[in-house]
Amino acid sequence: MLNNSIHSLQKRLLAVFVLVAFIFLAIIVRLGYVQLIRGSWLTAKASQQWYRSLPLSAERGVIADCNGNKLALSYSTFDVYVRPNSVQNANEVALILSSKLGLDYDKVYAKIINKKLSEVCIKMQVDEATCNDIISCNLAGVVMSKNNKRYYPYGDLLTQVLGFTTVDNVGQSGLELYYDKYLKGVSGLSLEESDVSGKKIDNTAKKYIPSISGMNLNLTIDVNIQVFLEQALNNLMVEQKPKTCTGIIMNPNTGEIVAMSTKPSYDLNNVPRSDVQTLLDTSRNIGVVDVYEPGSTFKVLTMASAVEAGVAHLSDRFYDPGYRIVDGEKIKCWRLSGHGSQTLTEGLCNSCNAVFVDLALRLGKDRMYDRFKVYGLGETLGIDFMGESGGILMNKSTAKTVDVARMGFGQAVAVSPLQLITAFSSVVNGGKLMQPYFVKSVKDGNGAIMYEKSPNVIRTTISTKTSDIMKTMVEQVVKQYSGFNAFIPGYRVGGKTGTTQKYENGRISGKYIASFVGTFPADNPDYVILILADEPSGSSYYGSVVATPYAKQVIENIIKYKNYPADNLEDDLKLVEKNIRIPNVVGMEINKAVYMLQQLGLFVEIEGEGSEVREQFLPAGEMVSKNSIVILTT
């Protein structure tokens, strides 16, 4: 009996011992877990309760042009915060802050008396002078945190290319958005000990986690040439009154974007954030993201393709009665009476639709679509910019012969301005389709290169032999034909004009896009320039008048800036003397108009039986040689 009691007691003691041992083991395991596994997390949580932090904004990187001129930089500002639990006189603080910061008193007061918040931001990016003024008032509970504000020294220059940032210095559009991860840097913190109510504990040291400045961008843009382009586009907006206009200047040998602009624009230091529609419309980089039917400027690509494929030769002749009939449809040339017999070169210089219908049909649908791919049409080119368009190509399987015929002269196909200038550049640079780009390099604050872009040949489009032929052709267009408004005595300029009808709901709208693509120097181009005006509403809508003269303005400024020497000046001056500027005869009585034009040495063709001139082609203002034909519509 006694033995049984002892045995039972031993079992109970053992159970108690095991239980106590298990509890101690659990405590040890828990302590180990808390100390070793969760220690860092718990320390951080404690720090959050006992430390109050202020952000230290990283300085955003500088954006500079190819010569080091700063296009976007940051300067120091301050964010004003209030710690409600430290405020001694809420009314006084609200009154002073609202007055000096230009804010509503009631809104500031409501923030200050909200004791549930340990800290509240009153206003961001306040200038240093204003902050010093506030500091001098010795307001308890008011603290400042250093920040940065973006500044664009050139105002409305490169509006769509550079883009802008939020007040928090986050890229919102343009290169500021595309390269935001490089530009933004890493923010730091200023930490100070505080009690449970958020008040700073006296005699405690602050801790700092320093910010890391953003990296700097070095662009392909030359700000001087950018100024030339924007001046020309501003002139175009005033004189030709288009809805918008766009310009791109490319180095055809590297793909570097030397200048790019769209008008209208806005000052990047005063972004119209309150007008969302205006902001969206004027922030859109039309040169990269929009598409249009290129019209006659596209004929250069068709011509180069035909010569390269061996289906067209300089010795070929074409007869143009004023139209071609394809699939039962009549495709008219702009000159309704036709150009008659002409050479291949004359076909381009005359911008004769019939010739390019023939060339497109000689190439055929398969080769035409192959050429589109070769030129980078229907796909993006990989430029370092958000929203790049790949253009629009009709589905090959549904394209009819008449569609292919129209593609030959730039209809039934849509491209972005960037695609057109890149493809055009390949025609005059020896046949290399270069990838376009904006940023040459990314460097850290010490100047170390973190990223560097080298010219990239996407593919070969044509042979150097074909390229040489095309360079000569486009120079002839400028010397004696529709591109003469870009002619500069003593300098070799090439180019092709374009006038495109716009369609709305499948019908001709009566609105136009006028364009010009120019090359300089024509024999070995350093620059290819595209000028495009959407819906000009001045005295003309032809590319030769609306776009070409403004490309000439840019080239003339580049000549002075880069000190290009003149050549064959005397011969070119004689050529100018032989040319005539077409007068405006629209609205004149037909007999008077004919007499005026004939007195200038021009031939006249009349379409219609009216007594007054309703429309004329060649357009007023265009420079042409004597014996050129002006078509008057009555």
Outline where the language-model segments fall.
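Short, gly/Ser/Thr-rich active-site loops of penicillin-recognizing serine hydrolases
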Residues: 449-455, 545-584
